[in-house]
From Swiss-Prot:
<comment type="subunit">
    <text>Homodimer. Heterotetramer of two MnmE and two MnmG subunits.</text>
</comment>
<dbReference type="InterPro" id="IPR026904">
    <property type="entry name" value="MnmG_C"/>
</dbReference>
<dbReference type="GO" id="GO:0030488">
    <property type="term" value="P:tRNA methylation"/>
</dbReference>
<protein>
    <recommendedName>
        <fullName>tRNA uridine 5-carboxymethylaminomethyl modification enzyme MnmG</fullName>
    </recommendedName>
</protein>
<keyword id="KW-0285">Flavoprotein</keyword>
<dbReference type="GO" id="GO:0050660">
    <property type="term" value="F:flavin adenine dinucleotide binding"/>
</dbReference>
<keyword id="KW-0520">NAD</keyword>
<dbReference type="Pfam" id="PF01134">
    <property type="entry name" value="GIDA"/>
</dbReference>
<feature type="binding site">
    <location>
        <begin position="273"/>
        <end position="287"/>
    </location>
    <ligand>
        <name>NAD(+)</name>
    </ligand>
</feature>
<dbReference type="InterPro" id="IPR049312">
    <property type="entry name" value="GIDA_C_N"/>
</dbReference>
<dbReference type="GO" id="GO:0002098">
    <property type="term" value="P:tRNA wobble uridine modification"/>
</dbReference>
<dbReference type="InterPro" id="IPR040131">
    <property type="entry name" value="MnmG_N"/>
</dbReference>
<dbReference type="InterPro" id="IPR044920">
    <property type="entry name" value="MnmG_C_subdom_sf"/>
</dbReference>
<dbReference type="Pfam" id="PF21680">
    <property type="entry name" value="GIDA_C_1st"/>
</dbReference>
<dbReference type="InterPro" id="IPR047001">
    <property type="entry name" value="MnmG_C_subdom"/>
</dbReference>
<keyword id="KW-0819">tRNA processing</keyword>
<keyword id="KW-0963">Cytoplasm</keyword>
C-alpha cells in the first residue's frame, strides 16, 4: 500500500561511486538528502577491479577531490599499494593508481555517509520516479513509500534489469551475487527516456594460497607515496605487491577450442561491451598475432585471501575457465573462489542530458555514472559529484555548474557523453583531452577548487590549504624569475658537476631550470636562500618551467575554444528553420540541442559548413536584438 514517507530536497537512487559523491555533495551543500540503495552492504562496492585511479582515471579522482569530493580521501585511508604510472612519459599523462582494500574502502565510505549531516542512508528499492507537468515530484519504493522531493539523481549503475552470463548459463541478478532492479527501467521508459543494453564483465578471483608467486614478476608499490587528496598530507604505510604473469599458447588453445561456447561469439550476449577492456577470449581471437597477454594478480585486501586475476575478464563456461587459468605460469594449482562473468544491463542514451547532467525534458531529474553509458568507478564518481552539485544548485534556485573541456577531464567526460553519445561503455583516456598539458593531475586544485568553493562544497579547511599552496607556488615562481645566477667560477663548477654546460653570462634561475639535465631540486646548491617548501611545489615548478612554450600554445588554443563556447544557441531554436543546414545536421542538432557553437561543432554529423551556417544565423539573430554572447 502506498503511503507518504516524508519529503527531501534531493533523492539519490543508488549508493555506488556516483551515488556516494552525489549524495555527499548535495548534503554538504545544505540540502536534505536521501540516498537509497538495494542493500546497505553494497555502498561504494567495487564489483570489479580492486583499485582506484590509473591512466586518466587518476586525473578524475584528483578533480573530484579538488571540487570537495570524497573518493580521493577515502582511497588514501584504505589503499594497500600506491604507484605513479607513465613516469617515463611527459607530465600530462602521469597518473596515480592505488590498490584498494575493497572492504575497508566500502566500510569507510559507508561510515562517511552515515555520519554526514543532512544525509539519510536507507536500504530501499526505488521502482518509479514520479513526474508531473515535466517536473520531478518524488520517488516510489517497492514497499509503497512515496518520498516527495525537488530533485532526483539516478545513479543505479549496472543494476537495471541486469543479467549474469557464464557460458550457456544466464540468470537475472546484479553484480557480485547481489539482487538487481527490474522495475525502474519501465518507469524510465514511461517517462520517455531511451534505454539501451550494455555489457561489462569481471575476471575470476582465486585463493592466494594456491598461487605460486615464484613463477611471476613482482610489482611493488612506489617508495614515495603520493596521496590522491590534496588535504591528506604525508602517508607512511606498509604496502603489498601485485604480481605479473602471462598467458601462453596453451591458454590460447583452450580458448580457441571452446570459443563456440562463448556467449560473446554464439550470440547469447546482446549488449555492447567495453572496447578498451576486452575479455580474454576477445583478446585471443582479435589479436592472434600475439603469443601472450599480460595477467596481473592483485590482492583484494589485507584480510582476505582473494586475488583478482586482472586481464582475464571472461564469460566462458566455468569448466573452461578452470582449464584456462591452470595454463598460466604460477596458476597451475589455482583455486577459483569467484567465477568470472559477464553482466548485461540497461543504461540511457546520455545525449538526453544537459551539461549539468539534468534530463532535457524532465525538470529536476539528474543522472550520473554507469547508467549514463560510462564505465569505471572514477568516471562514475566524477559524474556523481557534478550531478550532486547541480541538483543542490537547482534546489537553491541558482545557475548550474558547467565544466568545459578546458576545465578538466570531468568536463571532457561529460561533454563527450552528452554531445557525441556512446555506443559502448565509455572509458576516460588522456588522448580524449585536447588540452591535457593544462589538465594535469598535479594542478587539479588550481583548476577546480575555487569552483568548488564558490558553489559551497569546498570546506574552509580545504580552502585555506589551497590558498597556502597557491601562494607558495606563485611566490616561488616570482622569486625564481628574479633570482640571477652569475657565471662566476664557483657557480660554473657546480653546474658542470650536475652534468650541464658552463654559463657564458648571468641567467635567471627560472631559465636555468629549463635545461633538461637540471631541475628545481638539483639547483638547490646554487640557491642558499631557497624557502623550505613541500616537494609537490618543486615538481610543479619543473613542469611549468620546462613546458612553458607548450603550455602557452595550449592556453591560446583554449582562448580560441572559449570564443565558440561563448556563442550561445537559443534553447528553443528549431533547426528546421535555419536555412542551408543539411538534413543530417538538422536531425542531430534538434536531438542534442547544443548549448553553443563549440558544442555543436563536436557533434558527429555536423560539418564545418553547417557551423558556418549557424554562425551566419547567429549574427542575423543578434542583429534582430537578441543577444547570443555570454
Amino acid at each position: 500500500m502506498r503511503y507518504n514517507a516524508g519529503s527531501y530536497d534531493i533523492v539519490v537512487i543508488g549508493a555506488g561511486h556516483a551515488g556516494c559523491e552525489a549524495g555527499l555533495a548535495a548534503a554538504r551543500m545544505g540540502c536534505k538528502t536521501l540516498v537509497c540503495t538495494l542493500t546497505l552492504d553494497s555502498v561504494a562496492m567495487m564489483p570489479c577491479n580492486p583499485n582506484i585511479g590509473g591512466t586518466a582515471k587518476g586525473h578524475l579522482v584528483r578533480e573530484i577531490d579538488a571540487l570537495g569530493g570524497e573518493m580521493g580521501v577515502n582511497i588514501d585511508h584504505t589503499f594497500i599499494q600506491s604507484k605513479m604510472l607513465n613516469t617515463s612519459k611527459g607530465p600530462a599523462v602521469h597518473s596515480l593508481r592505488a590498490q584498494a582494500d575493497k572492504k575497508k574502502y566500502q566500510e569507510r565510505m559507508k561510515k562517511v555517509l552515515e555520519t554526514q549531516e543532512n544525509l539519510h542512508l536507507r536500504q530501499l528499492e526505488v521502482v518509479s520516479v514520479e513526474v508531473e507537468d515535466g517536473k520531478v515530484k518524488g520517488v516510489l519504493t517497492k514497499n509503497g513509500a512515496f518520498f516527495e522531493c525537488k530533485a532526483v539523481i539516478m545513479t543505479s549503475g549496472t543494476y537495471l534489469q541486469s543479467r549474469i552470463i557464464i557460458g550457456d548459463v544466464s540468470y537475472s541478478q546484479g553484480p557480485n551475487g547481489l539482487s538487481n532492479a527490474n522495475e525502474l527501467s519501465k518507469s524510465l521508459i514511461d517517462l520517455g527516456i531511451d534505454l539501451r543494453r550494455f555489457k561489462t564483465g569481471t575476471p575470476a578471483r582465486i585463493n592466494k594460497r594456491s598461487v605460486d608467486f615464484s613463477k611471476m614478476i613482482e610489482q611493488p608499490g612506489d617508495e614515495e607515496i603520493i596521496p590522491f587528496s590534496f588535504i591528506s598530507g604525508n602517508i607512511d604505510r606498509d604496502q603489498v605487491s601485485c604480481w605479473l604473469t602471462y598467458t601462453n599458447e596453451e591458454t590460447h588453445k583452450v580458448i580457441q577450442e571452446n570459443i563456440h561456447r562463448s556467449p560473446m561469439y554464439n550470440g547469447s550476449i546482446k549488449g555492447v561491451g567495453p572496447r578498451y577492456c576486452p575479455s580474454i577470449e576477445d583478446k585471443v581471437m582479435r589479436f592472434q598475432d600475439k603469443d601472450r597477454h599480460q595477467i596481473f594478480i592483485e590482492p583484494e585486501g589485507d584480510d582476505t585471501e582473494e586475488m583478482y586475476v586482472g586481464g582475464m575478464s571472461s564469460s566462458l563456461p566455468e569448466d573452461v575457465q578452470v582449464q584456462m587459468i591452470k595454463t598460466v605460469p604460477g596458476l597451475e594449482n589455482a583455486e577459483i573462489m569467484r567465477t568470472a562473468y559477464a553482466i548485461e544491463y540497461d543504461c540511457i542514451d546520455p545525449t538526453q542530458l544537459k551539461a549539468s547532467l539534468e534530463f532535457k525534458n524532465i525538470d529536476g531529474f539528474f543522472s550520473a555514472g554507469q547508467i549514463n553509458g560510462s564505465s569505471g568507478y572514477e568516471e562514475a564518481g566524477a559524474q556523481g559529484i557534478v550531478a550532486g552539485i547541480n541538483a543542490a544548485l537547482k534546489v537553491q534556485g541558482k545557475d548550474p555548474m558547467i565544466l568545459t573541456r578546458s576545465d578538466g577531464y570531468v568536463g571532457v567526460l561529460i561533454d563527450d557523453l552528452i554531445t557525441k553519445g556512446t555506443n559502448e561503455p565509455y572509458r576516460m583516456m588522456t588522448s580524449r583531452a585536447e588540452y591535457r598539458l593544462l589538465l594535469r593531475q598535479d594542478n587539479a586544485d588550481f583548476r577546480l577548487t575555487e569552483i568548488g568553493h564558490n558553489v559551497g562544497l569546498v570546506t574552509e579547511e580545504r580552502w585555506s590549504k589551497f590558498q597556502e599552496r597557491k601562494q607558495n607556488l606563485e611566490r616561488e615562481l616570482e622569486r625564481l624569475k628574479e633570482l640571477q645566477i652569475t657565471n662566476k667560477t664557483e657557480n660554473n663548477e657546480k653546474i658542470v658537476e650536475l652534468g650541464s654546460t658552463e654559463l657564458k653570462k648571468p641567467i635567471r634561475m627560472y631559465e636555468l631550470i629549463k635545461r633538461p639535465e637540471l631541475d628545481y631540486f638539483s639547483l638547490a646548491c646554487l640557491d642558499p636562500e631557497r624557502p623550505d617548501l613541500p616537494k609537490d611545489i618543486g615538481d610543479q615548478i619543473n613542469i611549468i618551467a620546462r613546458y612553458e612554450g607548450y603550455i602557452q600554445t595550449q592556453l591560446e588554443q583554449v582562448a580560441q575554444f572559449k570564443k565558440f563556447e561563448k556563442k550561445v544557441l537559443p534553447e528553443d531554436l528549431d533547426y528546421n528553420d535555419v536555412n542551408s543546414l543539411r538534413i543530417e545536421a538538422i536531425q542531430k542538432l534538434n536531438k542534442i540541442r547544443p548549448l553553443n557553437i563549440g558544442q555543436a561543432s563536436r557533434i558527429s554529423g555536423v560539418s564545418p559548413a553547417d557551423i558556418s551556417v549557424l554562425l551566419i544565423f547567429l549574427e542575423h539573430y543578434r542583429k534582430t536584438g537578441k543577444n547570443t554572447d555570454n
